[in-house]
Amino acid sequence: MKKIKTYENKNILILGLGKSGFSVAKLLLKLGAKLTLNDKKDLSNDDRAAELDKLGVRIISGYHPVEIFDKEKFDYLVKNPGIPYENPMVEKALKLNIPVITEPEIALNVSEAPYVCVTGSNGKTTTVMLTQRIMDHHLSKNGGHAYAVGNIGVPISEVVEKATDKDLLVVEMSSFQLLGVTDIKPKVAAIVDIYNNVHLDYHKTFDNYVEAKLRITQSQDQNDYFIANFDQKNILDRELKKTKAKVQTFSETDKTADYFIGDEYLESKDDHQIMKISDIKIPGIHNQQNCLVAIAISKLMGADDSDIQYALSTFTGATHRLQYVMTYNDRKIYNDSKSTNIEAATVAIPSFKEPEVLIAGGLDRGFMFDSLVPLFKKYVKSIVLYGETKYLLADAARKAGIKDIVIVNTLQEAVPRAYELSEAGDVILFSPACASWDQFNTFEERGDFFVKFIKELKTK
């Protein structure tokens, strides 16, 4: 870890505990900062808060003490990425011209290990996991490691102390995190895709959302690389105007891109066949595109075809992202709880050749599901719907001509009904197309319950 003086003896307010708040607090203490941590939740019985308190961090919880800015001067406010900029503490800090930063920028600025960054509306976690797997295989030959960090669930500040210049950080960045960075310079940055109707409750407009994503490349220069989706032409134009890095592209079908999906192989435009598609374990065209991004990043960071082939042929998928759960009575069952929007379901549903029994539904964000009608018509034989959006999804299913439409209240009810509708040789796919918050705290919790309910089928 680099010993920088930026935060030494600085008075810093951390807003929000959570995983990243806890980790960045410990990092900042080692960098010599004086810390106050505030969380709207009561932290009086929180073990992490108690640990920080023993280390000398002042803890203020249960409310936001906006008046604290009138009593003392802060040099920085470190904001949990999920806290909106309309938060009164953030608004007050900005009004006083106090820099508002986030954990990734602090951690990456002290990292001795080089780093690459990946963002996107869908597919970024799988891409990060694939890249980490390829690069770990490559770096291990010389005693190094690749670490998957960031929005994937492991704070960067948790890893930077042990990561050396022999290692690599593969960083997943959300739009929330990117909005709070001003000076990160990844050797390779990649945007997997950008779709509308994602996080507009936070960013307010699609244009704001795109601009947040583009911050991943804003500090890159001609010595760096930017990986862009050749098929999203409207986004590509903005990316090319924004970046100063060398650009490489990937495409589902266009052979003029640097990397593309061929008939039997993932290929590069120099007619090089990199990976046999039939050897890739994770299903779906979208996952083949994720593989292309991981290949592009890894090639630039020194990996060879053998590293790529080993990693892609042994990777069975990220949890809650078209995750294979089990085969039960000749039905293959998949958990795609990360399908929190229509676009995610759009890429999941066409991933299988077998007839599908689909389970969908969740939080109503005011979207219509008519765009799913052609996919329902082509791939879905039966559908079980639950949650706030069940009737809206049922309308789309009727338009698609699906005869077996079952409406229930909860996911627990949906699972056995889906099994009853299925036959040997079918796929049972849980791809909600909606956020989880009507019945679950997170998509991870929702996916865990789905797997639990599936396993309960075997006991009945």
From Swiss-Prot:
Pfam families: Mur_ligase_C, Mur_ligase_M, MurD-like_N. It catalyses: UDP-N-acetyl-alpha-D-muramoyl-L-alanine + D-glutamate + ATP = UDP-N-acetyl-alpha-D-muramoyl-L-alanyl-D-glutamate + ADP + phosphate + H(+). It is found in: Cytoplasm. Its EC number is 6.3.2.9. Keywords: ATP-binding, Cell cycle, Cell division, Cell shape, Cell wall biogenesis/degradation, Cytoplasm, Ligase, Nucleotide-binding, Peptidoglycan synthesis. InterPro entries: Mur-like_cat_sf, Mur_ligase_C, Mur_ligase_C_dom_sf, Mur_ligase_cen, MurD. ATP binds at residues 120-126. The keyword Disulfide bond does not apply. The keyword Cell division applies. It comes from the Bacteria. One of its GO terms (biological process) is cell wall organization. GO terms for molecular function: ATP binding; UDP-N-acetylmuramoylalanine-D-glutamate ligase activity. GO terms for cellular component: cytoplasm. Cell wall formation. Catalyzes the addition of glutamate to the nucleotide precursor UDP-N-acetylmuramoyl-L-alanine (UMA). This is UDP-N-acetylmuramoylalanine--D-glutamate ligase. It comes from Lactobacillus gasseri (strain ATCC 33323 / DSM 20243 / BCRC 14619 / CIP 102991 / JCM 1131 / KCTC 3163 / NCIMB 11718 / NCTC 13722 / AM63).
